[in-house]
Amino acid sequence: MEDMNEYSNIEEFAEGSKINASKNQQDDGKMFIGGLSWDTSKKDLTEYLSRFGEVVDCTIKTDPVTGRSRGFGFVLFKDAASVDKVLELKEHKLDGKLIDPKRAKALKGKEPPKKVFVGGLSPDTSEEQIKEYFGAFGEIENIELPMDTKTNERRGFCFITYTDEEPVKKLLESRYHQIGSGKCEIKVAQPKEVYRQQQQQQKGGRGAAAGGRGGARGRGRGQGQNWNQGFNNYYDQGYGNYNSAYGGDQNYSGYGGYDYTGYNYGNYGYGQGYADYSGQQSTYGKASRGGGNHQNNYQPY
């Protein structure tokens, strides 16, 4: 009964919200769980780990197209001592498979995120509306509104930079936000040097990330697959090529701000960007003149 109560408590929050809210920071209560059966559900994992302590958040990563488990996830315990209890047990078996729990290590050298990418933004949303919505989370340092060079109209995304990281944590507690007339997705803008580091770490995997389903110029849904072409301040892998994030390199290096170089679970890559966008892809236009040279330093998760 106690385990079920603990599970019901975490249902009050969006799955993974507490884990994602501090993804780039060390938290002694967080664990990475690899080697999961594709049949293992969030409930199964939570109930199993609850015997070691109260679980306050749990998420299993899935392929955005098929919905199939990628074979790994993250869990957050209320008490860091629970992590030690898990690690004291040398062997863990769930749904007929040996699973691989490890401490979640924040990537070294990463600054707390202060900049977010907002995807799915209606070009009709005024700058004042954007300021009003995002300003409610904290003090804004800068807003970047990229333009389409051909139409001279706003593109369907923007970047928000805050003066500190706390507003970003609050924003990430919910993946989707209703802004103006559209439902938008929020992602952290990742420094380019960290992205490069992750790519170097992943070279030993089963092919490059762009060699996934369809590759960088592979199967797309309309123009959405290439909406970053010409927006050269950002990596194509993160914005334009939704299919490039599937398959290919299976290392866990850098997933969600954690370093798991060399762990090759599952048959799906976890991607570098917006692999999970669907119907809104064609909204984002074609080319852009960007929004300032400081954009050169970022790449979203």
Curated annotation (Swiss-Prot):
Residues 194-229, 279-301 are annotated as: Disordered. GO terms for molecular function: DNA binding; RNA binding. The modification Phosphoserine is found at residue 122. There is a cross-link at residue 90 (Glycyl lysine isopeptide (Lys-Gly) (interchain with G-Cter in SUMO2)). Residues 223-301 are annotated as: Necessary for interaction with TNPO1. Keywords: Acetylation, Activator, Cytoplasm, DNA-binding, Isopeptide bond, Methylation, Nucleus, Phosphoprotein, Repeat, Repressor, RNA-binding, Transcription, Transcription regulation, Ubl conjugation. It is found in: Nucleus; Cytoplasm. GO terms for cellular component: cytoplasm; nucleus; synapse. It comes from the Eukaryota. Coiled coil: none annotated. Acts as a transcriptional regulator. Promotes transcription repression. Promotes transcription activation in differentiated myotubes. Binds to double- and single-stranded DNA sequences. Binds to the transcription suppressor CATR sequence of the COX5B promoter. Binds with high affinity to RNA molecules that contain AU-rich elements (AREs) found within the 3'-UTR of many proto-oncogenes and cytokine mRNAs. Binds both to nuclear and cytoplasmic poly(A) mRNAs. Binds to poly(G) and poly(A), but not to poly(U) or poly(C) RNA homopolymers. Binds to the 5'-ACUAGC-3' RNA consensus sequence. This is Heterogeneous nuclear ribonucleoprotein D-like. It comes from Mus musculus (Mouse).
